[in-house]
């Protein structure tokens, strides 16, 4: 590793004199403390990678013939991108932090728990995550909410139109929660989570 070049890059990053270092990723604001820390660690990783990646491959990269993606995370024991098995996590429960999360009993709670899963994954890796067939994966929780509304209908003699409207509202509100939370929560490296949702229909 060229320590003089590493020192120069770190110094230029800290005094913000090299915009290639401070603005290298449009999704990362170098003024945020956690992003600043992430970018600084990335400088070290890129330099260290020069010594651990085969020389001919690094030369290929450095000469511009190709690009080795995510050199700023190369030396970290983090995963890059994943297909989250959220249906299993929701159904069987999981532990996040020190809390044991059990299976949600309604659609709205399932959406809230799903945002917590997304946040935990985003803070434990770099890159994107996919929530495949979200309509299929969340359908059991729409059913749980419907079953609750049917019980309420029976107990209070409510109309079918009323409970159908209540279910529509819960689904809308749950989706809104999922949208707002995943777009406003910031991961440990200072970014909103990169998420792909797909429908199974």
Region roles according to the model:
Residues 1-201:
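Catalytic alpha/beta active-site cores
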């Amino acid at each position: 590793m060229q320590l003089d070049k590493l020192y120069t890059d770190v110094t230029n990053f800290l005094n913000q004199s090299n915009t290639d270092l401070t603005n290298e990723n449009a999704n990362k604001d170098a003024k945020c403390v956690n992003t600043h820390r992430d970018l600084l660690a990335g400088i070290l990783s890129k330099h260290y990678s020069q010594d651990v990646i085969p020389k001919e491959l690094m030369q290929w990269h450095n000469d511009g013939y190709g690009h080795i993606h995510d050199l700023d995370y190369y030396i970290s024991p983090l995963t890059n991108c994943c297909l989250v098995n959220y249906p299993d996590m929701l159904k069987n429960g999981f532990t996040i932090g020190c809390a044991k999360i059990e299976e949600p009993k309604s659609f709205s709670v399932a959406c809230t728990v799903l945002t917590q899963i997304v946040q935990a994954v985003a803070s434990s890796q770099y890159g994107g995550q996919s929530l495949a067939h979200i309509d299929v994966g969340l359908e059991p929780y729409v059913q749980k909410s419907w079953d609750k509304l049917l019980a309420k209908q029976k107990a209070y003699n409510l109309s079918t139109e009323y409970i159908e409207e209540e279910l529509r509202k819960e689904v809308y509100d749950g989706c809104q929660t999922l949208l707002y939370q995943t777009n406003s929560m910031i991961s440990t490296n200072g970014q909103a989570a990169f998420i792909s949702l797909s429908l199974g229909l």
